[in-house]
Amino acid sequence: MGQTSVSALSPQPGSVDGLDKASIANSDGPPAGSQTPPFKRKGKLSTIGKIFKPWKWRKEKTSDKFRETSAVLERKISTRQSREELIRRGLLKELPDQDGDVTVNFENSNGHMIHIGEEATQEENVGKPEEGNVSVCEKGPPREEQAEEKTAGSSHPKKTTGSKASSSPSASSTSSHPRGPKESLTGKAGAVGTTRGKKKISKQPAAAASRLSPNTVTSETSSLKGELSDTGVESLKPEETVAGAEEEATGKPKAVVVALPPVTVPPSSPALPLPPEDPCTIALDTPMVLVSDGPTLPISALETSPLPGTEEPANRTTPYSSTGLGGSREQAKCFTTKDGLGKAGPQLLTPGQMGDSLESFSAPEDEAPREYQANDSDSDGPILYTDDDDEEDDDDDSTGESALASKIRRRDTLAIKLGNRPSKKELEDKNILQRTSEEERQELRQQIGTKLVRRLSQRPTTEELEQRSILKQKNEEEEQEAKMELKRRLSRKLSLRPTVPELQARRILRFNEYVEVTDSPDYDRRADKPWARLTPADKAAIRKELNEFKSTEMEVHEESRQFTRFHRP
């Protein structure tokens, strides 16, 4: 489940710690002395266009969601149990070994190696070419390996984790050339992988590969055969094509490094290496097999085909982050069959075959990034993440094409859904619809008919309803006669009304037939308010008169005189 990195021969390998790895992964471009072509950089004016395209603003949220998903996957992978533990608990079958000297290296959930078989032969074979400061595959003790990976994993940025494979950053440790600037190890340079066939590597000495003894060749080819037949190689890494190009440049055969994918609990996913720019990276998390001078391994055995042992489809890849999408383009077509590689195990890739097959292992650069937006094989469901930079470039180039493509995609998904709808026969087979014959349908109709007839026969007839006076019989002649009778009755009542003289004679009406009319002037009909017209002098005179009247003329009892109220003068 870890990241796969392969080491080639280097004059002075130096280990890169986690801090350097973080700076390498975050670097935007290649150094000055690198042989990689320059990256496709977007101009400064392309970012200004985003201001006028509000429908693209929502794309910034994808990276946050992707980072959270990566953290969750990292936590889950760190707690995953090893293969030995699962075999011990009986959840996995142990694969039988074909040869006695086969060395199969599995990795557990943390990216560490679990060595099964004879580890001494593996270390001996790897240790032989280490003469004159040349290392093919630096392989220390497991404790040193674990400590090194822990330090690397703690400082590895989360940007380079794109899926379950890339979300365990402690899975790879690199060694670089003694040159000053470091090349980017992640797949941020998307165009580098596609031009891998043109790249020539001239920094490794050509004589280092010839130091491998014939014993090393035979043991390694037999171990290759055993490992390929036992575990089933799922991918041939792009670094092998680099080694082939190196052989063509130097004219001498060199060691081809085949990285075997880790065997994990199903559902299994294909091995997902991040293509390194530097050919001298060291794989500490995947088993390494060195193949050298011997029979040739044909390219036809390495063509893409599904693995019979796995349940996943062969074309199923995992989404990479925006920095690792370029690397996935080389690895999308690198799945091999278990049977084909099991038969062709002891053979080798000759320089001519490797040179001819460079084009077959590099995917075209103009492939849409949507092809690599696939489901993750973990049980948490898909990580829906696409490369925002590539999408923005595509949208800037052809907005109409993307709209048309999305419309076609919508129609395709609708057609797929309609095509997946089960037929009537399938529903009957699944016992969702009851299977009925023509006779059964006829019987059902007859039952419904008899039930309706029985209900209708229980309804009362019109005669019964008329007898109960519920339904009245309607006749036009009778209706006309009823109307005429009503008119006659009303006219009779009106004819019996007394006349006005009769009412006057009975003194019921008392009024004069003639009315006298007189003219009168208009006047104010409002109430009269004399106090509103009194002057203050008038009011003072009234108060004085009242006081005199109360004091002299009004009869008041002597004991109650003190209670007599006088007005103010």
Swiss-Prot record:
Region described as Disordered: spans on this chain: 1-47, 98-253, 295-483
Compositional bias ranges of the Basic and acidic residues kind: 140-151, 423-444, 461-483
Biased segments, Polar residues type: 1-13, 212-224
UniProt xrefs under PROSITE patterns: RPEL
Domain of life where this protein originates: Eukaryota
Stretches with biased composition (Acidic residues): 386-399
Compositionally biased spans, kind Low complexity: 162-176
Xref: SMART domains: RPEL (SM00707)
Stretches of the chain forming a coiled coil according to its record: none
Positions where Phosphothreonine occurs in the chain: T36
Keywords noted in UniProt: Actin-binding, Phosphoprotein, Protein phosphatase inhibitor, Repeat
Tissue: Expressed in the brain with high levels in the cerebellum, specifically in the Purkinje cell layer, choroid plexus and thalamus (ventral, rhomboid and anterior nuclei). Moderate to high expression in the hippocampus, piriform cortex, olfactory bulb, entorhinal cortex, as well as in geniculate bodies, lamboid septal zone, preoptic area and ventral pallidum (at protein level).
Residues found modified as Phosphoserine: S27, S357, S457, S495
Per-repeat ranges for RPEL: 71-96, 412-437, 450-475, 488-513
Pfam family for this entry, one: RPEL
Disulfide bonds: none
GO biological process: actin cytoskeleton organization
Gene Ontology molecular function, alphabetical: actin binding; protein phosphatase inhibitor activity
Matching PANTHER family: PHOSPHATASE AND ACTIN REGULATOR 2 (PTHR12751:SF5), PHOSPHATASE AND ACTIN REGULATOR PHACTR (PTHR12751)
Family: Belongs to the phosphatase and actin regulator family.
SUBUNIT field: Binds PPP1CA and actin.
Protein name: Phosphatase and actin regulator 2
Record organism: Rattus norvegicus
Gene: Phactr2
